C-alpha cells in the first residue's frame, strides 16, 4: 500500500486563484444509503454514500464485447463520497489522530466491501484539497471509485515490481524504503511503523510517499487498531499533511492499493 501526496497536474499557478463554490451540499443531513461511523452520542462522525453525479453506475453487467479490433463495455463501477467530518471547512491537519483513524477505518471497510464485487478490478481513493486541486466544495470529503479495469499507470508499476522481484527476489517498494531510511535526506516523517519521504526523482511538486515499514500490499489487510495499524498510519499521515500545508494549501492525496484479488478476469 502507498499514499501519494503532492501537486500533480498543476502546470502553473493561475493569475486568479479559483475559489470554492458558495453552495455546499447538505451532507450533514443526508441519510439515504449511507454507511457511517458514529460517536457515543449516536451521531455520525464519518459517513459514506453514493455520489449524486457518479462517474460510473453500479447497476448491471459489464457486457464486454468486441467491435472488430476494439473492445467495449458499459461504464459499470461505483462512485462514493466519504464525508470526513460534520464540521465545515476543516482541513486534514486540523483533525485529531483519532478522527483521521475513523476516516481510514470507514475507507477500509468500503474498500473491502467493494472488493466483494467480482466486476471491480480496482478501487481508487482520491482527495482533492482546495480549488487549485479541482475541489469546488470546501466541506472535508474524498472520493472512492471502483472500476472494472486496472489503471494503466498501476499496470506499469506492477510490471516493474514483478521484474524487480524476478531479478532480485525482493519487493521493490521495500527496497526503495530501506534505501531512503539509510540515506535519510528525503525523509519527511518517520514512525516505528510508517515512513513518509520524497522520492528520489519526484514527478510533480512536493510529491511525498507514505509506506508501511513492514511489507504489506493491501490497504484492506492493515490492522484497524494499534500503532502498526490505521491509528499509527493516521498519526503519521496527519503530521505529513501538516508539514505539506506549510508550503502549499492545495494538493492531491491518492491511495495506491493492490488490485482486487477477487475480481473476474476478462475472457481471452
Which positions does each model-derived feature cover?
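HIT superfamily nucleotide-processing domains
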Residues: 1-268
Amino acid at each position: 500500500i502507498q499514499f501519494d501526496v503532492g501537486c500533480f497536474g498543476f502546470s502553473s499557478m493561475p493569475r486568479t486563484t479559483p475559489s470554492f463554490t458558495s453552495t455546499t451540499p447538505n451532507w450533514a443531513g443526508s441519510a439515504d444509503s449511507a454507511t457511517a461511523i458514529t460517536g457515543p452520542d449516536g451521531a455520525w462522525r464519518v459517513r459514506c454514500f453514493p455520489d449524486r453525479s457518479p462517474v460510473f453506475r453500479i447497476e448491471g453487467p459489464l457486457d464486454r464485447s468486441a467491435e472488430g479490433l476494439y473492445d467495449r463495455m458499459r461504464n459499470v463501477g461505483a462512485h462514493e463520497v466519504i464525508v470526513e467530518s460534520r464540521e465545515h471547512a476543516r482541513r486534514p491537519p486540523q483533525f485529531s489522530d483519532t478522527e483521521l483513524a475513523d476516516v481510514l477505518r470507514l475507507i477500509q471497510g468500503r474498500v473491502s466491501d467493494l472488493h466483494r464485487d467480482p466486476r471491480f478490478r480496482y478501487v481508487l481513493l482520491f482527495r482533492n484539497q482546495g480549488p487549485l486541486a479541482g475541489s469546488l466544495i470546501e466541506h472535508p470529503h474524498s472520493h472512492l471509485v471502483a472500476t472494472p479495469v486496472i489503471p494503466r499507470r498501476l499496470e506499469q508499476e506492477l510490471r516493474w515490481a514483478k521484474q524487480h522481484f524476478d531479478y532480485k527476489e525482493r519487493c521493490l517498494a521495500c527496497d526503495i524504503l530501506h534505501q531512503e531510511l539509510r540515506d535519510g535526506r528525503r525523509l519527511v516523517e518517520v514512525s516505528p511503523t510508517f515512513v513518509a519521504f520524497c522520492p528520489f526523482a519526484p514527478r510533480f511538486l512536493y510529491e511525498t510517499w507514505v509506506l508501511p515499514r513492514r511489507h504489506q500490499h493491501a490497504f484492506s489487510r492493515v490492522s484497524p487498531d494499534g500503532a502498526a495499524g490505521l491509528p499509527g498510519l493516521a498519526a503519521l499521515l496527519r503530521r505529513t499533511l501538516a508539514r505539506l500545508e506549510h508550503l502549499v494549501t492545495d494538493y492531491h492525496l491518492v491511495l495506491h492499493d493492490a488490485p482486487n484479488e477477487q475480481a473476474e478476469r476478462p475472457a481471452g
